């Protein structure tokens, strides 16, 4: 929504609805906190990775990074997710690297591929956790991909990911603005990760680093410096970020196309692209294109680099968990 990032007449028209949204969400949070509304406590610690605003903020790379950090500590980790974009007829659903993204959702399938840990999806987070623990009874920790505002699920740790480039938009709550909660919510979380340069709100800065491109058909890996004139597509929360990354790598983008986040792809959507030039896409998009990929299609995986004393302090909390399992 373009008007979320400015203050137009549409913004002011919707402001009363934003006040109603704030009133309802604040009351719900209070009722959960006081125990008037029932909430679920998982038998193992839960880490929620979420954000304050609608749209892509870089949560998935953070989840993948966090899984790997905890695995290095010897912990067995599982992931749960709402599974946005999933069209499964059965929930909860155990997502594996081989699950069809139409059924499992693009982000859960990507997480399963990159981490090899069990991923369960359901709008009911309790049901997702119960299925996950049936599959992996010795799980030490569960990471919830998104769900910061899902107060029905009790949590032990909270991480918020902020996109510096878009910030808080016009600063208003839904539907006048992009915010699900007010920025004051940041005062209660355990770690704030800024996607992009640091801001006054962030504890640490995250950089998404691309190293190479992988061919969707052959699996060949190639240096990004080998690519010069390319086409590119992106079906993520902020497509321009991907296009800018490629341009910063000295690539000339001869054709680009931005799709909606969690877009379901079909071969017909790609017929207008020049088949003689490489077509680059995100890894999240690639998992949905494997069944009809062409030999000139490549995806660019990224690794989250998150450093700093506050990260070390946060991760040190899980050393004690390891000692008790």
UniProtKB/Swiss-Prot annotation:
Keywords attached to this entry: ATP-binding, Kinase, Lipid A biosynthesis, Lipid biosynthesis, Lipid metabolism, Nucleotide-binding, Transferase
Residues at which ATP binds: 53-60
Gene Ontology CC: plasma membrane
Metabolic or biological pathway: Glycolipid biosynthesis; lipid IV(A) biosynthesis; lipid IV(A) from (3R)-3-hydroxytetradecanoyl-[acyl-carrier-protein] and UDP-N-acetyl-alpha-D-glucosamine: step 6/6
GO biological process: lipid A biosynthetic process; lipopolysaccharide core region biosynthetic process
Chain ranges passing through the membrane: none
Record GO terms (molecular function): ATP binding; tetraacyldisaccharide 4'-kinase activity
InterPro entries noted in UniProt: LpxK (IPR003758), P-loop_NTPase (IPR027417)
Catalytic reaction list: a lipid A disaccharide + ATP = a lipid IVA + ADP + H(+)
Highest taxon above the source species: Bacteria
E.C. numbers: 2.7.1.130
Family: Belongs to the LpxK family.
Entry function: Transfers the gamma-phosphate of ATP to the 4'-position of a tetraacyldisaccharide 1-phosphate intermediate (termed DS-1-P) to form tetraacyldisaccharide 1,4'-bis-phosphate (lipid IVA).
HAMAP family xref list: LpxK
Protein name: Tetraacyldisaccharide 4'-kinase
Name of the gene: lpxK
